[in-house]
Amino acid sequence: SVLGTDISTITDVDGRFTLKEIPEKAQRIRVKYIGMQPKDVKIRPIMNVTLDLEKKLAFFIQAGVGVSGYNLENNNEDIYGGNNHLYIQGGVGLNYNFSTYFSLQPSVNVVAKGCKNMGRRGSDGQGEITVDPVYLEIPVLIAARFIISDFGRLIFNAGPYAAIGIAGKGKYTDEWEGTSMKFDLFSGDEAVLKRFDAGVQAGFAYEIKHIGFSYTFGYGLLKPFKEWNKEWGATPHNISHNFGLKYIF
């Protein structure tokens, strides 16, 4: 079918087709066949179009880098810092295709997040804390796929995620005493983070055949810290910005 018009045709037994009286403004056609992925191609005098088999399930591996931190919002000048932390992640997942344009994308990822130099000053002293937690994160996203070129697809996705802390160290520095100590983030008497987190993710990706490039924003809905004094300001939440690379099998 010619996009933007009501002109269409069907192929013969050998897969050949002819389109006539195409308007000059028309630029692309869409080729569809049962059980195959549709493809939009630029109109040319002679076209050789190859369709890919439409899979219900497609596994993928992914890796990425990003920045994470906590959305510190307070009017207390004694609370400062919380610089964004550069992190890496990697994982596996699958696309379950409901249709040509919609799919479910569950995945399992190992994600290293955290923040640097979040500090508090007061009459009793001044200290800074850096946290480097590692989570096992499981997002379940709904994706919408749009064919925008002969080979490329634009993907928009969104959905919830759940995460469990599996490792991580923190460091506390006493600025007055000039001393520091390290501790486990999720276990022990000095642990400061809750082990479980959950939130929402949303993003977009561009896929070329088996390769995908993506951006994802994540926002935690649970309180990450075990203790947080209201005098320090609003309770912070996990936030993240991730840039990823995906290979689809």
What is each PLM-predicted segment?
Residues 48-91:
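Short glycine/proline- and aromatic-enriched beta-strand/turn motifs that initiate or cap beta-hairpins
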Residues 61-67, 88-98, 108-110, 138-144, ...:
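Residues on the lipid-exposed face of transmembrane beta-strands in outer-membrane beta-barrel proteins
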Residues 73-80, 123-130, 186-190, 227-233:
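Extracellular loop and loop/strand-boundary signature of outer-membrane beta-barrel proteins
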